[in-house]
């Protein structure tokens, strides 16, 4: 669904810190920190993951999954145009 690296990249594109992402998503700061520290796909309960993805989408972030159109063919993020 989303990786820790995608979370960090999305925050960088938005110019926000972990605390601000926690506020936007309705999740706790420790939850955001734990999710971002994941080496691969973030593990968590479905509700938390959905809150995170919805908050990023509302801010204009598009998640790029493996195998979709990107320069590298790997996961990433971009701002919707």
Outline where the language-model segments fall:
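DNA major-groove recognition helix of helix-turn-helix/homeodomain DNA-binding modules
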Residues: 46-63
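A short, Lys/Arg-rich alpha-helix, primarily the initiator
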Residues: 1-12, 53
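Residues in the recognition helix of alpha-helical DNA-binding motifs
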Residues: 10, 24, 35
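Residue-level recognition of specific faces of alpha-helices
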Residues: 6, 31-34, 76
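Helix-turn-helix/homeodomain-like alpha-helical modules used for DNA recognition
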Residues: 61-81
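Recognition helix of helix-turn-helix/homeodomain-like DNA-binding domains
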Residues: 27-44
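Short basic helix-loop element that most often maps to the first helix and adjoining turn
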Residues: 7-20, 81
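Residue-level "edge-of-site" marker
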Residues: 24, 45, 69
């Amino acid at each position: 669904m989303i990786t820790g690296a995608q979370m960090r990249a999305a925050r960088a594109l938005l110019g926000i810190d972990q605390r601000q992402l926690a506020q936007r998503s309705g999740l706790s700061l420790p939850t955001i920190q734990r999710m971002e520290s994941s080496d691969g796909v973030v593990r968590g309960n479905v509700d938390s993951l959905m809150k995170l993805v919805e908050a990023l989408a509302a801010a204009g972030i598009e998640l790029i999954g493996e195998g979709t159109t990107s320069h590298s063919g790997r996961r990433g993020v971009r701002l919707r145009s």
